[in-house]
Amino acid sequence: MSEIAQKVKSIIVEKLGVEESEVTTEASFTNDLGADSLDTVELIMEFEKEFNISIPDEQAENITTVGQAIAYLEQHVK
């Protein structure tokens, strides 16, 4: 698992209060991990802060699973 993937998982566990075993790449923030729309926005903001990047709203809307978050960050974090 990449360093980015591990950080993403840690942020999700901390912010959503879920078990690390629940945070799989296929897991949906809302359907599987119990996040509401505000939680999802807060996750995106935390990813931006942790990785020092800006995620445009139109792209943030497409990040709905753990795997999508990891893939986006691995592409955009230098």
Swiss-Prot record:
Record has Lipid metabolism as a keyword: yes
UniProt modification remark: 4'-phosphopantetheine is transferred from CoA to a specific serine of apo-ACP by AcpS. This modification is essential for activity because fatty acids are bound in thioester linkage to the sulfhydryl of the prosthetic group.
UniProt keywords, alphabetically: Cytoplasm, Fatty acid biosynthesis, Fatty acid metabolism, Lipid biosynthesis, Lipid metabolism, Phosphopantetheine, Phosphoprotein
Domain Carrier: 2-77
Keyword Amino-acid biosynthesis attributed: no
Function statement: Carrier of the growing fatty acid chain in fatty acid biosynthesis.
Protein name per its UniProtKB record: Acyl carrier protein
Organism: Cytophaga hutchinsonii (strain ATCC 33406 / DSM 1761 / CIP 103989 / NBRC 15051 / NCIMB 9469 / D465)
